[in-house]
């Protein structure tokens, strides 16, 4: 496969695109990157790192499905590498624009434009599968997760972004 000069591989077949440019656009990617860089979700990132460090072997294979601009993916990659457990790590997202941003964040990760419902990976390849705030594709996740592997799923709670909702809807 050809790797784009930005550092990602495009693996989304035309029949899996439901719009001309699926997923987040360049402006959304920049806004999310700026927001996350302010540390608002650092506690979540640190918690994920602790969970993964406690469950991973020496060189785990980790897939972040719906990785967005790579905030969690890159943070976990760096934490594992610093702990002497360098992972083989991949992040997928349906948005080409957002993966351009992700690839700039960390070059040691394999980034691919792909659907979480049709992941372009072999059966049973992942020791750990991560899904943070992305669509849940359970059948596909079961397919790619190794027997005995770990699935970490992050979903927003009822009060997620409550302060913002109050401003918008009052």
Question: Model regions: which residues?
Answer:
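N-terminal auxiliary segments of SAM/dcSAM-dependent transferases
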Residues: 1-21
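Class I SAM-dependent methyltransferase Rossmann-like catalytic core
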Residues: 18, 23-47, 51
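Short helix-loop-beta connector
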Residues: 54-61
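A short glycine-rich, Lys/Arg-flanked "PGG" loop and its adjoining helix->strand segment in the class I
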Residues: 138-150
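Conserved class I S-adenosyl-L-methionine
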Residues: 150-170
């Amino acid at each position: 496969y050809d790797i784009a000069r930005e550092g990602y591989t495009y693996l989304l077949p035309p029949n899996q695109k439901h719009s001309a440019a699926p997923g987040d656009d360049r402006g959304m990617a920049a806004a999310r990157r700026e927001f996350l860089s302010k540390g608002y979700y650092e506690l979540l990132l640190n918690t994920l790192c602790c969970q993964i460090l406690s469950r991973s072997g020496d060189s785990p294979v980790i897939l972040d499905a719906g990785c967005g601009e790579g905030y969690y993916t890159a943070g976990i990659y760096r934490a594992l590498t610093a702990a002497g457990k360098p992972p083989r790590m991949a992040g997928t997202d349906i948005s080409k624009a957002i993966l351009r941003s992700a690839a700039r964040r960390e070059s040691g990760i394999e980034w691919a434009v792909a659907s979480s419902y049709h992941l372009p990976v072999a059966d049973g390849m992942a020791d750990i599968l991560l899904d943070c705030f992305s669509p849940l594709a359970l059948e596909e996740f079961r397919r790619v997760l190794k027997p005995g592997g770990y699935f970490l799923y992050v979903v927003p709670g009822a009060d997620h972004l409550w302060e913002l909702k109050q401003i918008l809807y009052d």
